[in-house]
């Protein structure tokens, strides 16, 4: 059987692409080396932030606004909401370049963002402590996503729509010819007119020339009481320290508050190098500088997990066809800030398989930027 689209890697982007392409009437085969959702990539750990006024650059705002529409639609397919509108407060020095980008994005796209000085911040959320030179930019319409629930939902909807799914079966080789794309797996060879490579951290095992660096990252859950929960209107957050370190976190659930450090981590070259949480001496203490100074009421570390970022050289996404192979789209280099975009990236992949022109300017995400 010849498929219209083969998806290599069915984590966040691949799961979304499988659903949207199948829903559009295409014959789709989804593949994955493991059984998604799983612990081997970048989507586990239950929750991910979604921010609209984007500190990483205005070019992302149209994408994330479309993603939000798709998240809202996906949430209707579950009794438990996939998106929780907790609000997100971005904390940092008043002269922070990241916060300047947030403010600029909000102004350009007329987004609901409130600026609070240090006193106003600590009055609204007495649990937060910041220096006098800090500000907060609060996005009331943003919040967090339940990442594994989202992937489970996409997989179920795709399967119900007739999508073929081949999991626990790594792709070993990709071949291109005039008739399309052929993949080799432990279960045999499969052929399609087009392919999406959304293999996450270890994409270079299939496409060695891609400029992607795997980075081992950790996040952890700390003891917290009801003051830090959504019931008390405590928001999700990002926080920039005076030395430039960037943290992110979520409202407490079941008396546990999850937090991670966005920058840093350990460069790795193979899956076995992604050691479990606490295998690196600094893991348990990584969040201490932020907690001690900004959230001093949080208790000790309860447990943690390791994941991986697939970093591009500039930490912007890679969304492009493979050089010389216009029938193969690669989406990678999401650099630790990609999950919130998964539905719109999946929709872009489905449009690619349908032969449609993208609805967004994807020029900033082309591979050619690295050869200029």
From Swiss-Prot:
It catalyses: N(alpha)-methyl-L-tryptophan + O2 + H2O = L-tryptophan + formaldehyde + H2O2. Its EC number is 1.5.3.-. Coiled coil: none annotated. FAD binds at residues 4-34. The modification S-8alpha-FAD cysteine is found at residue 307. One of its GO terms (molecular function) is flavin adenine dinucleotide binding. It comes from the Bacteria. Monomer. This is N-methyl-L-tryptophan oxidase. It comes from Salmonella typhimurium (strain LT2 / SGSC1412 / ATCC 700720).
């Amino acid at each position: 059987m010849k498929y219209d689209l083969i998806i290599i890697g069915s984590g966040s982007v691949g799961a979304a692409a499988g659903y949207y392409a199948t829903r559009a009437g295409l014959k789709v085969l989804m593949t994955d080396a493991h059984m998604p959702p799983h612990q081997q990539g970048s989507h586990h750990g239950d929750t991910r932030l979604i921010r609209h006024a984007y500190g990483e650059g205005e070019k992302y705002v149209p994408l994330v606004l479309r993603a939000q529409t798709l998240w809202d639609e996906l949430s209707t397919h579950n009794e438990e909401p996939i998106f929780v509108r907790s609000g997100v407060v971005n904390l940092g020095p008043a002269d922070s370049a990241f916060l300047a980008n947030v403010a600029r994005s909000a102004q350009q796209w007329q987004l609901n963002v409130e600026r609070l000085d240090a006193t106003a911040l600590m009055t609204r959320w007495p649990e937060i402590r910041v220096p006098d030179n800090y500000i907060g930019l609060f996005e009331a319409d943003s919040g967090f996503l339940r990442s594994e629930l989202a992937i489970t939902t996409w997989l179920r909807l795709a399967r119900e729509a007739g999508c073929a799914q081949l999991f626990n079966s790594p792709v070993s080789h990709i071949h291109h010819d005039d008739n399309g794309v052929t993949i080799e797996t432990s279960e045999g060879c499969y052929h399609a007119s087009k392919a999406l490579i959304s293999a996450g951290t270890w994409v270079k095992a299939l496409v060695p020339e891609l400029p992607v660096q795997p980075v081992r990252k950790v996040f952890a859950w700390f003891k917290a009481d009801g003051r830090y929960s959504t019931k008390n209107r405590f928001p999700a957050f990002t926080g920039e320290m005076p030395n430039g370190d960037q943290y992110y976190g979520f409202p407490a659930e079941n008396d546990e508050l999850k937090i991670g450090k966005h920058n840093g981590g350990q460069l790795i070259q193979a899956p076995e190098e992604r050691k479990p949480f606490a295998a690196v001496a600094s893991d348990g203490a990584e969040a201490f500088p932020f907690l001690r100074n900004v959230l001093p009421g949080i208790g000790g570390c309860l447990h943690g997990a390791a994941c991986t970022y697939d970093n591009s050289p500039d930490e912007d996404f890679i969304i492009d066809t493979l050089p010389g192979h216009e029938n193969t789209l690669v989406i990678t280099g999401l650099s630790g800030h990609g999950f919130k975009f998964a539905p719109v990236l999946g929709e872009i992949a489905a449009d690619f398989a349908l032969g449609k022109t993208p609805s967004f300017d994807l020029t900033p995400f082309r591979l050619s930027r690295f050869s200029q």
